[in-house]
Amino acid sequence: MHDVINLTGYRSILCLNGDLPGPSFFSTKNVPIIAADGAANHLFDLGVQPQLITGDLDSVHPDLLETYPFLHVADQSSSDYQKAMGYLKKNDLLPSIIVGINGGHLDHILNNINIFMETNCLLYAPPIKGFVLNEQSRINLALLPHTKISLIGIPIATLSSIGLQWELHNAQLSFPGTNSCFNRTLHPEIFLEVHQGSVLVLIYEQMIEDAGLTAPSQNW
């Protein structure tokens, strides 16, 4: 069973062509590292070796293709992210930790989120960890009090919570529309339940020290 908080139980790391964590992140994970096209360039700069480079390979430095194994997928109807996910699925390397999903052009980021919503993977963009909670799902999360958390319905969802500063009671969340951004945990354990739709859950690794810690509580 994979652990969305401690990043354990995942079968691979998929690197997209965005902002990547530092080298120490990769050295502590004993799983295959797969680079989606140009992400291999960033891994090289970090001194991290991918097990495979895949995609249409129009962004990776040619020298790296002489050094590391690669799989060229020419299909222009899918993104490098989707091509890499196809490889992971075929080779039983899911669920995966997805890094590099942010950074770069806004349209790329939005498309990456769109693809991510269809997966059972973990988004890791320090200091944020993210995952999708689907319809009729429940989860208990052990988090430090005052941990910042955002809950976004994509495209629309109904969710309830226990243990947040601004509780949600059958709250309708939608994108575009109203969401629960920059909420905070009140207790060491919180409970989330999605009644309908899918929710993107984004959790900050560090406790956030700001004025929100002393703001009066309110209910949705």
Language-model regions, residue ranges each:
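Structural motif
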Residues: 15-19, 99-103, 126, 203-205
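Anionic-ligand-binding alpha/beta catalytic cores of soluble enzymes and soluble regulatory domains
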Residues: 92-139
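N-terminal beta-strand-loop-alpha-helix module at the start
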Residues: 1-63
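Histidine-anchored nucleotide/phosphate-binding helix
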Residues: 28, 39-40, 44, 85, ...
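Short phosphate-binding loop-to-helix
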Residues: 69-92
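Short, solvent-exposed amphipathic alpha-helical segments in soluble enzyme
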Residues: 28-31, 49, 113-116, 216-218
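Long, charged alpha-helical interface segments
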Residues: 133-220
